[in-house]
From Swiss-Prot:
Family: Belongs to the DnaA family.
Record's protein name: Chromosomal replication initiator protein DnaA
Annotated region described as Domain IV, binds dsDNA, given as residue ranges: 331-450
Binding residue positions for ATP: G158, G160, K161, T162
Length: 450
């Protein structure tokens, strides 16, 4: 059966690019066969997961062309790699926070700070998009329960809210090792509350949280609509505030925009300082990538950093994930990171913006997508079947071209620039609420860029 795999590899080499084949298929080894299943091994989990995700159907087709249509392929990590992983098990952040409530006990009064030591002010890249939030967080860290209590930081996913929140805790502990600091997601706070209610240990729960010097709660929006959790957090907030203890929370929205959040909590969040984090510009993204690459020992060429920053989303976490993937491929294959490698390795999650998109291209593409005429898209007709595509097209023009608001208005039938601004803001606001709209715009964006 090993001959079958070698032949299948040879066939795949003819249809895949050299870069793809040598990176993902060549490292796969024959491990045996059982009945009608071919057993294959990847040298590590990273390659196994990537091959399973992107190339397993192609592998299966190649193997079946040499055997029969009922043949199966099973891909595992090499045994020696599994043993290495087993010796150093790591529980993921998600498991820690979102594990089954039934399996947990109510946490004792003693606590862990839950702080990630890597998230400090030194490792945070400051730019125009996050400068205000950074300054506010640093001020709170240097003077807890001073001017800004509570501190409410809000912004989109992956922009650095958790980093700043954790940096505050780490800075406070650097100055005072005896400070009672605790970082919790609102989900974990709720899970612990549920368990303490179940085991009738509410006094222990209250003693734990109401005796903190600094309470850091991430993603507070998740307690919205949870009456008992909001009730308990409200009293915890009051107890800490009245004791002149610092409270810092993060959210993906401004307090007034969180649906299901009680008015009494909303008003308390507005007592202190509210700071927002905006998506980073290209220069800031390049700086973030460079700092992360230096920290992780990854040699990242300037042209690749610029390619990632120009082509990727504004989600910093996603940006760093791409860098980690590139670093892993370079390390596992013994090759240097190049622009060609970046395009190949990240082609499933990145779009290349080197092709210039024009307003006219967007109008034609959106009109075709919604099966309407370009003239209707540019008209003043207020039919819903035309208004929504028109607003989407205007939003994409602002997002993908360098055209100014007046320029866009001129190309949409001479509309006033204030109308164009309204359309952009309207779509921008709806994107956080309407997942169908978000999916449509993402599909159109990728189609235009590809």
């Amino acid at each position: 059966m090993e001959d079958v795999w070698l032949q299948a590899q040879s066939n795949l080499a003819k249809v895949l690019t050299h870069q793809t084949f040598t990176t993902w298929i060549e490292p796969i080894r024959f491990a045996g066969a059982h009945k009608n299943t071919l057993l294959l091994e990847a040298p590590n989990q990273f390659i196994r997961d990537r091959v399973r995700e992107s190339y397993l159907p192609m592998i299966l087709e190649s193997v079946r062309s040499l055997t029969d249509s009922h043949f199966q392929v099973e891909l595992q990590v090499a045994a020696r790699q599994q043993e290495k992983t087993a010796k150093s098990p790591r529980k993921s952040h998600t498991e820690d926070e979102l594990g089954p409530v039934e399996s947990e006990k109510c946490a004792p009064a003693e606590f862990s700070t839950n702080l990630n030591a890597k998230y400090t002010f030194d490792t945070f890249v400051c730019g125009g998009s996050n400068q205000f939030a950074h300054a506010a967080a640093l001020s709170v860290a240097n003077n807890p329960a001073g001017k800004y209590n509570p501190l409410f930081i809000y912004g989109g996913v992956g922009l650095g809210k958790t980093h700043l929140l954790t940096a505050i805790g780490n800075q406070v502990l650097t100055k005072n090792r005896k400070a009672r600091v605790c970082f919790y997601t609102s989900e974990k706070f709720m899970n612990e509350l549920i368990n303490c209610l179940r085991y009738q240990k509410m006094e222990q729960f209250r003693n734990k949280f109401r005796k903190m010097d600094l309470l850091l709660i991430d993603d507070i929006q998740f307690i919205a609509g949870k009456e008992r959790t909001q009730e308990e957090f409200f009293h915890t907030f009051n107890a800490l505030y009245e004791s002149h203890k610092q409270i810092v929370v993060t959210s993906d929205k401004f307090p007034k925009d969180i649906p299901g959040l009680e008015e009494r909590l909303r008003s308390r969040f507005e007592w202190g300082l509210i700071a927002d984090i905006q998506p980073p510009d290209t220069e800031t993204k390049v700086a973030i990538l460079s700092k992360k690459a230096d920290s992780d020992g990854i040699r990242l060429p300037d042209d690749v950093a610029l390619f990632l920053a120009s082509s990727a989303s504004t989600n910093v976490r996603e940006l760093e994930g791409m860098l980690i993937r590139l670093g892993a491929v370079a390390s596992l294959t013994g090759k240097n990171i190049t622009l060609d490698m970046a395009r190949e390795v990240l082609k499933d999650i990145i779009v290349d913006k080197t092709k210039e998109v024009t307003v006219e291209m967007i109008q034609k593409y959106v009109a075709d997508h919604f099966n309407i005429k370009v003239a209707e898209l540019k008209s003043d007709k207020r039919l819903k079947a035309l208004v929504v595509p028109r607003q989407i097209a205007i939003y994409l023009c602002r997002d993908l071209t360098k055209a100014s608001y007046p320029d866009i208005g001129e190309k949409f039938g001479g509309k006033d620039h204030s109308t164009i601004i309204h359309s952009v803001k309207k779509v921008d606001k709806l994107l956080s609420q309407d997942f169908e709209l978000k999916s449509t715009i993402e599909t159109l964006r990728k189609g235009l860029l590809n």
